Amino acid sequence: MKASMFLALAGLVLLFVVGYASESEEKEFPIELLSKIFAVDVFKGEERGCKGFGDSCTPGKNECCPNPACSNKHKWCKVYLGK
């Protein structure tokens, strides 16, 4: 009875350690992925020579890329859905 309790406790400790180690690796992965996504997005914006979604703009100057357009109300590039 004591041996089975010891094995169960040892198994739980091992499970906790493995879970904690994998969780710490998973926390670094999304940060790394987001930094790569934003780095690529910034590079594409510089390459195009136009402003992307969420960038400030002046209405009527056509500074935004073809898909996002400059909002007259908010003065930033946004995507218009519909008409």
Swiss-Prot record:
GO terms for cellular component: extracellular region; host cell presynaptic membrane. SUPFAM superfamilies: omega toxin-like (SSF57059). It is found in: Secreted. InterPro entries: Huwentoxin-1, Huwentoxin_CS1. One of its GO terms (molecular function) is sodium channel regulator activity. Disulfide bonds join C50-C65, C57-C70, C64-C77. Residues 1-21 form the signal peptide. Keywords: Amidation, Disulfide bond, Ion channel impairing toxin, Knottin, Neurotoxin, Presynaptic neurotoxin, Secreted, Signal, Toxin, Voltage-gated sodium channel impairing toxin. The modification Leucine amide is found at L81. Residues 22-48 form a propeptide. It comes from the Eukaryota. Expressed by the venom gland. PROSITE patterns: HWTX_1. Pfam families: Toxin_12. Lethal neurotoxin. Selectively blocks tetrodotoxin-sensitive voltage-gated sodium channels (Nav). Does not affect tetrodotoxin-resistant voltage-gated sodium channels or calcium channels. Belongs to the neurotoxin 10 (Hwtx-1) family. 15 (Hntx-3) subfamily. The presence of a 'disulfide through disulfide knot' structurally defines this protein as a knottin. Monomer. This is Mu-theraphotoxin-Hhn2m. It comes from Cyriopagopus hainanus (Chinese bird spider). The lineage of its organism: Eukaryota, Metazoa, Ecdysozoa, Arthropoda, Chelicerata.
